[in-house]
């Protein structure tokens, strides 16, 4: 959430920044409601003070045995006025909060402007052994009899997958490898619920805007779209001591997404699923450290691709392609020979104080309070890593080779990849 006082003071600046992110709301109306709410608040405080004075006068008159009827009538009139004003205040407060929760974060000043992904900026390409073309991961998995699309469709419909044997073991090995990498970089591992309440999704920014992409299980509960939601919301309505930051958290979870806006896109295989595995990294840092923390987050994720010897590139997203809550995002895109292009495998974002304001998470040194900055990123999306390994290291008649160290490990044999 953006501080409404800042919006009021820098209205033209916020209009321009939010317009670059595709925001279509009326900031003038938001500021007008904010001013009206403040005006009512001042009036309420004045009348409540008058009523308190009147109550004391009534008490004094009563002690003296003098008439209090006129004063009581005045007090009742003030009570009625307070009730009406309080109702107006509550309505405005609710409307203002709803609008503020629907306003996206503004892009950082160094984020390139643009309407869509065509304006994204490639920062770096890292190339290893790279096939220019080849079969896709579904064909490879079915040839190896380790991926069963028909079974997944029978069980759950489209955008699901069944893995078995060595491929299921490889996925488990990748998860362990990624968690070990996170631990070596100072992240504390968490096990978190896979079902969260609406307040949690409001805190990180998935609600209210992206309600259609969430899997609701009823009674205000949802399946998590990413471990970012439970990890970050652990500190909702909490005060964090400056002595305890940076806080670095990680979790492996399944993630659930309705993919409401992607009908017909990537329906084959593991590119875009309703259920997928991911290792998430989350940071709480001092505001002065968040830019450096984003670079470190990207490095933590890209180092995994380096160790797996998968070709990738770093891409900074333009303003129009940024997520709702993000101030700046750097994607890692892995090379997929079957598509002859790079596809996203990690998205690392700096949210600044956008999420902590929504969650009412404070940073305190004992005397003053501010809002810490949050960051998160995937390290990595497990399914997309798995399919990238399949496509980049598949050799007909041999199987799929995964390099997690200088020595190759053959997934068609008994040895599995590890972080060693």
Tell where the protein language model's regions lie, with residue ranges.
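Conserved small/polar residues in nucleotide/adenosyl-binding loops
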Residues: 403-410
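TRNA-binding/sensing appendages of the translation machinery
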Residues: 77-216
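Hydrophobic alpha-helical segments, chiefly the membrane-spanning helices
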Residues: 414-420
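Residues forming anionic-ligand binding surfaces in small-molecule and nucleic-acid pockets
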Residues: 133-168, 172, 256-288, 359-376
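N-terminal alpha-helical targeting/anchoring segments
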Residues: 1-126
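A translation/RNA-centric and nucleic-acid-associated enzymatic feature enriched
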Residues: 237, 247, 251-272, 282-284, ...
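A domain-level signal for the structural core that forms small-molecule/cofactor-binding pockets
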Residues: 187, 194-199, 227-243, 257, ...
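Acidic, His- and aromatic-enriched active-site or binding-groove loops in soluble protein domains
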Residues: 208-225, 338-341
């Amino acid at each position: 959430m953006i501080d409404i006082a800042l919006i009021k003071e820098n209205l033209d600046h916020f209009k321009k920044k939010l317009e670059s992110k595709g925001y279509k709301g009326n900031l003038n109306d938001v500021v007008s409601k904010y001013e009206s709410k403040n005006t009512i608040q001042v009036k309420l405080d004045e009348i409540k003070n008058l009523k308190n004075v009147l109550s004391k006068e009534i008490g004094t008159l009563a002690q003296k045995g003098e008439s209090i009827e006129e004063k009581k009538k005045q007090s009742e009139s003030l009570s009625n006025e307070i009730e009406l004003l309080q109702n107006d205040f509550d309505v405005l407060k609710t409307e203002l909060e709803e609008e503020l929760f629907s306003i996206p974060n503004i892009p950082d000043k160094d984020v390139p402007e643009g309407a869509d992904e065509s304006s994204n900026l490639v920062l770096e390409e890292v190339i290893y052994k790279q096939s220019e073309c080849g079969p896709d991961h579904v064909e490879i998995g079915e040839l190896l009899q380790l991926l069963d699309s028909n079974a997944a469709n029978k069980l759950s419909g489209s955008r699901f997958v069944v893995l078995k044997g060595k491929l299921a073991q490889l996925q488990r090995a990748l998860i362990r490898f990624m968690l070990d990498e996170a631990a070596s970089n100072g992240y504390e591992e968490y096990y978190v619920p896979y079902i969260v309440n609406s307040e949690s999704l409001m805190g990180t920014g998935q609600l209210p805007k992206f309600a259609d992409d969430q899997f609701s299980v009823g009674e205000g509960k949802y399946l998590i779209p990413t471990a970012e939601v439970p990890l970050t919301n652990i500190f909702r309505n909490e005060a964090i001591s400056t002595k305890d930051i940076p806080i670095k958290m990680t979790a492996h979870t399944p993630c659930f997404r309705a993919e409401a806006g992607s009908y017909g896109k990537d329906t084959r295989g593991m590119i875009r699923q309703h259920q997928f595995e991911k290792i998430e990294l989350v940071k709480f840092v001092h505001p002065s450290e968040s830019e450096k923390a984003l670079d470190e987050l990207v490095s933590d994720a890209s180092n995994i691709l380096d160790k797996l010897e998968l070709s990738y590139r770093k891409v900074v997203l333009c303003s129009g392609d940024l997520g709702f809550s993000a101030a700046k995002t750097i994607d890692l895109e892995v090379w997929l020979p079957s598509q002859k292009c790079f596809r996203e495998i990690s998205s690392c974002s700096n949210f600044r104080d956008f999420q902590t304001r929504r969650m009412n998470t404070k940073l305190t040194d004992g005397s003053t309070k501010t809002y810490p900055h949050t960051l998160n990123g995937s390290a990595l999306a497990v399914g997309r890593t798995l399919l990238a390994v399949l496509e980049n290291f598949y050799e007909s008649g041999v199987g799929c080779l995964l390099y997690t160290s200088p020595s190759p490990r053959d997934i068609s044999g008994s040895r599995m990849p590890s972080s060693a």
